[in-house]
């Protein structure tokens, strides 16, 4: 674009700004006031956006099993244990980075309300990242120490590189006491006992203050005189090849001084840190290997024939062929999809433990009798509950890859559990 055109555009902008009447600033001022005041009236967030995650992401990535968080009420300095199992789905979406590449066990909690004391998967410390194999089962444990009083919704989380956090089921934990009483010390490799809450705080404040002053001084030098911002841009366009004259000899001298001073500060900080902390350990970036739990023999085999979701009734229907190779009769007791547990109330009386516990106590309808040992039978189950709509799983019918994945749990008359992952295309029904 010709330089004259640039200059004309800039002049038009400036002329427009000059001719704005004071009465026109009223709506703008009101909008700015509402924007600034909004956070003061925003209600607190109760959870971590589980409903906002894509339905296929929740259904076809991780199956969380037997998640438990205990105790649910602790005081500051007391510990909370998050335990359970998870299984990466064999139907993992192909367009997403796989959990078999890089993953990390984490905890989802609002703010630094807890300190993680220990985390393990199958007994292996999870200080670093790892990888998890599809269709394999892993057992995890995370120990947290309460730091700040409040009521918190705690989730186990697996963070997958390139995919993001995959959130597990959650429970509310209440922390009582006073944060001033919180104590957390660690012993370094040299035997020094430190408090991470305040360690090297003086140095941190001084360094931040120094760089802040340097930045303000640099900006003040260039803003000390006109023109700046838009007027300066117009001036550069007007002067053309002579625009370099806007930068004076004192400007060059001050710039060289700032550059030299910053280099001296960086070098001085480097040598000071080496003197102050002569023994250091490099942050480790390698992965640890975690072997999956031994897989039990597949005594109950399942083949999905057809899966439909009836939109008017919020009913998910799966027709499947089941072969029972165990020694006892089995029956479907639970269907778990996207952290929602649909329970066969004829077998179990399981109630939600709190308002956000995703349990449909009578959401699983199984009309067939138990499947006998050695029998192969085609059965149909119905997972009916408003949670399909409440947690936006119905959006699956609008996705280009309308496939589902879930855990189906059979139980025999002695309470032995047999888990099967099922999945495949889901067909919406509007009738």
Where are the regions a protein language model picked out?
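Short beta-strand and strand-turn-strand segments in soluble, beta-rich domains
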Residues: 62-64, 110-127, 349-365
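Juxtamembrane interface at the cytosolic side of transmembrane helices
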Residues: 214-256
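C-terminal soluble domains/tails of integral membrane proteins
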Residues: 273-431
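N-terminal edge beta-strand
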Residues: 51-80, 295-304
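Internal/C-terminal transmembrane anchor helices
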Residues: 245-276
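Membrane-proximal low-complexity regions enriched in glycine and acidic/polar residues
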Residues: 74-168
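Short, aromatic-rich amphipathic segments at membrane interfaces
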Residues: 172-208
